């Protein structure tokens, strides 16, 4: 059973983890699928602490549908970050 937007309506989360296709400091987190973006957006709005799991190749990329602002989540990432990204407190490099 796949979680739909309707299924997600009454659910509240203490912590949540999401993937993303694109991360932009100015434009936020994005994905190419409208339904996926709607579920992610709604579930993030109902979550106390949001985490985005993404490798470093997702930074400075933008897919067609935005689901959250950059400051709405802590990004957990692997790989080397560009020096300009190291100043953001919501980006954590996992080794």
What function would you assign to each model-found segment?
Residues 4-95:
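Conserved phosphate- and dinucleotide-binding cores of soluble alpha/beta proteins
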């Amino acid at each position: 059973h796949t979680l739909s937007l309707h299924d997600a309506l009454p659910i509240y989360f203490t912590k949540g983890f999401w993937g993303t296709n694109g991360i932009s400091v100015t434009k936020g987190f994005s994905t190419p699928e409208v339904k996926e973006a709607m579920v992610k957006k709604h579930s993030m709005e109902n979550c106390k602490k949001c985490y985005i799991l993404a490798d470093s190749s997702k930074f400075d990329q933008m897919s067609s549908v935005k689901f959250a602002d950059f400051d709405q989540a802590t990004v957990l990432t692997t790989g080397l970050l560009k020096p300009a990204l190291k100043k953001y407190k919501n980006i954590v490099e996992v080794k």
